């Protein structure tokens, strides 16, 4: 009479458990990335509301002809948020906010929101740099963009 499980049976069970754990972890990680992107979108909307109020008071989205106003929300969901591009050269009545992941290796996507509250998510961002190098990565240069649906 045999008692217990054979080595082959235990290995099969371990294999099945590891496959299920891998699938669950992948789904969890994607869920977290999606939640972080939604948090960044909410912060972009809050900053856009600030920009609209600023425009109502000052008659321009710019602080000066070459400078943007300071945004109230600078980081959310693992993304840093800045104005895209320099104020100089941007048409009056226009702005674009941009959210770039603090860890660009883990999250290469970029989220942009313009003055019309149109949000796009871009799959790739050209250029190197980090959130502290605002000149380089907040200029534009995004690729594979599509509307953001949340």
Predicted feature residues:
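Conserved hydrophobic beta-strand within the GNAT/NAT acetyltransferase core sheet
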Residues: 7-10, 51, 99
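N-terminal single-pass transmembrane signal-anchor helix
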Residues: 1-28
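N-terminal alpha-helical signal peptides/signal-anchor transmembrane segments
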Residues: 31, 40-58
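Periplasmic/extracellular, small/polar-rich flexible segments of pilin-like filament-forming proteins
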Residues: 56-150
């Amino acid at each position: 009479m045999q008692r217990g499980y054979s080595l082959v049976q235990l290995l099969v069970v371990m294999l099945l458990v590891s496959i299920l754990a891998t699938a669950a972890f992948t789904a969890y990680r994607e869920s977290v990335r999606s939640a972080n992107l939604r948090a960044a979108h909410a912060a972009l909307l809050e900053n856009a509301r600030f920009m609209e109020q600023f425009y109502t008071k000052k008659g321009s989205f710019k602080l000066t002809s070459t400078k943007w106003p300071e945004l109230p929300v600078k980081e959310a969901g693992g993304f840093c948020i800045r104005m895209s591009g320099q104020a100089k050269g941007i048409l009056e009545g226009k702005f674009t906010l941009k959210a770039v992941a603090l860890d660009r290796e883990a999250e290469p996507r970029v989220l942009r929101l313009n003055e019309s509250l149109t949000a796009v998510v871009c799959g790739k961002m050209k250029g190197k740099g980090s959130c502290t190098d605002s000149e380089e990565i907040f200029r534009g240069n995004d690729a594979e963009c599509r509307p953001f649906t949340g």
